[in-house]
From Swiss-Prot:
<dbReference type="GO" id="GO:0046872">
    <property type="term" value="F:metal ion binding"/>
</dbReference>
<keyword id="KW-0472">Membrane</keyword>
<keyword id="KW-1003">Cell membrane</keyword>
<dbReference type="InterPro" id="IPR003524">
    <property type="entry name" value="PNAcMuramoyl-5peptid_Trfase"/>
</dbReference>
<comment type="similarity">
    <text>Belongs to the glycosyltransferase 4 family. MraY subfamily.</text>
</comment>
<dbReference type="GO" id="GO:0051301">
    <property type="term" value="P:cell division"/>
</dbReference>
<feature type="transmembrane region" description="Helical">
    <location>
        <begin position="300"/>
        <end position="320"/>
    </location>
</feature>
<keyword id="KW-0961">Cell wall biogenesis/degradation</keyword>
<feature type="transmembrane region" description="Helical">
    <location>
        <begin position="98"/>
        <end position="118"/>
    </location>
</feature>
<comment type="pathway">
    <text>Cell wall biogenesis; peptidoglycan biosynthesis.</text>
</comment>
<feature type="transmembrane region" description="Helical">
    <location>
        <begin position="275"/>
        <end position="295"/>
    </location>
</feature>
<feature type="transmembrane region" description="Helical">
    <location>
        <begin position="251"/>
        <end position="271"/>
    </location>
</feature>
<comment type="function">
    <text>Catalyzes the initial step of the lipid cycle reactions in the biosynthesis of the cell wall peptidoglycan: transfers peptidoglycan precursor phospho-MurNAc-pentapeptide from UDP-MurNAc-pentapeptide onto the lipid carrier undecaprenyl phosphate, yielding undecaprenyl-pyrophosphoryl-MurNAc-pentapeptide, known as lipid I.</text>
</comment>
<dbReference type="GO" id="GO:0071555">
    <property type="term" value="P:cell wall organization"/>
</dbReference>
<dbReference type="Pfam" id="PF00953">
    <property type="entry name" value="Glycos_transf_4"/>
</dbReference>
<feature type="transmembrane region" description="Helical">
    <location>
        <begin position="71"/>
        <end position="91"/>
    </location>
</feature>
<dbReference type="InterPro" id="IPR018480">
    <property type="entry name" value="PNAcMuramoyl-5peptid_Trfase_CS"/>
</dbReference>
Amino acid sequence: MLVWLFSWLGHYYAPFYAVSSLTLRALLAVVTALAFSMVFGNRVIRRLRALKYGQAIRNDGPQSHLVKTGTPTMGGVLILSAIGVSTLLWARLNNPYVWILLIVMIIFGAVGWADDWLKIKYKNPKGLIARKKYFWLSMGALFVGISLYYIATLQPDIATTREMQDLLIPIFKDWMIPFSAVPFGIGFIIFTYFVINGASNAVNLTDGLDGLAILPVVLVAAGLGAMAYVSGDVRFADYLHVPYIAYNSEVIIVCGAMIGAGLGFLWFNAHPAQVFMGDVGALSLGAMLGTIAVMTRQEIAFAIMGGLFVAEALSVMLQVGSYKLRKKRVFRMAPLHHHFEEIGWKETQVVARFWIIAIILVILGLMTLKLR
């Protein structure tokens, strides 16, 4: 929004043109979202307390967590508001990728909000009925797949249309899985569905300790932002042998907003947490990360960078599958972070060590850009 204002002012005073710079706008998006979170954070927390939107803690979880009962939840509203305001201010709003990400944020945030609200209203940690929850999450993921496929079909040359659908294989130069060969985009849409829903639920499962999920979200958003920048610049894309997709240039603004909003939220979510993001934050942030990975065609690199989320989700799948088949548990408790609590790690130790792992994984994911 403001980029158009400053471009117009640039006709009268040339330095205003500098604001149209992509890197400067990305930094401003970080600062704006961070400032928004810091300014309104305490107000949101006080409001959530006044509304008695306290977290319900499962009795079958770690007993040390029972002291967190009543801590305000649904703090993800603060994160999403900061992202929305910052993106609307600094992104070029004629870019369809920006609007898709904002719509994803709203859809998945709304589902998460309904889930959180039902947990609070009925004092029941289960929340929204599973089939209803996954129906709406599926609708959101399918919306992304169909929208991106439609945008790909509008491209003037067939090569770009293919690149916007085919799955890029990191490290191997010019290797791709040709989803574009499947008629009507069915292969691409189905794959997109699993990436987005998988990412959304994986982040949600990770959000179980103070500060555990939000910093890895910030780190992965930074990594994907770098990949969006590369993919959106024809020179870097050609040099690094990644698909050039012009729309990705503005995606870095959304990534910047996610970074700023996440860091601002961490201020209040660090141990001992004053507020939890809830499903409204976790589901939407995960879905946005998954969507950006699809937009940049870096789904495999995303799985590496978000390896912490992958491990948390796999731990639940293994635990449930093992118990149903063998009546035995693989871990003392799932998701994975609870297993380490059960073997004697303190909550702060689990969080700090998982953060270190997240940093390493993001670096490894970024290395795939150069190793080709």
